[in-house]
Amino acid sequence: MFSTLKSAIKAEDTRKKILFTLLMFLVFRIGTHIPVPNIDRTIIAQLADQAKLLGFFDMISGGAFKNFSIFAMSITPYINASIIMQLLTVIVPQLEQMAKEDRKKIAEYTRYLTVVLAFVQAIGVSFGFKSALVDSSFGSIALIALTLTAGTACLMWIGELITEKGIGNGISLIIFAGIVSRIPSGLFYLYQYIEANGAIGFLVVLLFAVIAYAAIVAVVAIHEGQRRIPVQYAKRVVGRKVYGGQSTHIPIKVNSAGVIPVIFAMSILMFPGTIASFFPNSGFATTIANIFDASGIFYNFLYAVLIVFFTYFYSAITFNPVDVAENIKKNGGFIPGLRPGRPTAEYISKVMGRITLFGALFLAAIAVLPALLMGLLDLELYFGGTALLIVVGVALDTMKQLESSLLMRSYEGFMK
């Protein structure tokens, strides 16, 4: 990893991409401290400390929620818009065709939907936090809603700029940056926990550290793991030359969906609990908040189910066994022991299904079990399995892209 970073810094084009990404991180961090007008941030901070879900939301926003800055809603409206658009491309035939032919149009629709969802959520936030409003007039609420919507649109733009001109997936990196920025406060909490609980507290934190280390090792292993399906290409004689005859393989990753299922599931589950937390005096809202308590059994069960669902869903739309089998057949290849065409597609689909199930269950376990364990240990820490999966997964994906960029650069240099 360090050798890759060293090589990337030496190469001028990749160095520029890294510096641009870091510059966007700086803009993001500055934005988390630009306050929204007409809001008492002390009350917001108290609510975030009292409600676990709001505390978790504050973590992924990089502290922007507690500060109630222009980035307080984070990038979640964009994630929700992406989920809706991806589901619609499966349901609506016209959108499915558009997704294959014109991805830019789908991206444009996603941006429009993001702004709409952000404005609706901003209105809900403005009315939900009435106790924190310095001025509750219509003009003040409209100003707050428009400021929050503009902040989300700005974050979306920053994410797209990172994807286009920087290194890695911009949206994932914004969430990554938000979580990483809260690590110092998390470490300080653990220090206070040890001071308050003495030897028992130290043992609890040590156990937490060992589990976290084991989880990181497991996440890296699963992220890099793959099943290789052998493919043989028949020999062809053209004139006096013999073509083909070589062996290769189809790499099927254990976790082909990456951290996308975790981010999607988290974004969906945060919505009802967050809305409920806006109405602390409502009995119905309190019931909803308790049901969607991040340390509760129901929440974590639903979280695991959604992770499994989105893992299968995302794998299905990014990897088509029929297309793979057709490409193998066109190029004169075959999987040993199988006829080209439909039998090959069915075999690849079967292997993909088994591997995806294992990867999905692993993601669900890493996301859910640490949260339940911290609930049992009474650790009020938001750096659970979800944060770990996002940080490690995004870091690995970014390093892969950096390596690919360096490899492409070396090929271009060779061609010149």
Please give the residue ranges for each predicted region.
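N-terminal cationic and glycine-rich segments that engage phosphates or anionic surfaces
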Residues: 1-96, 101-416
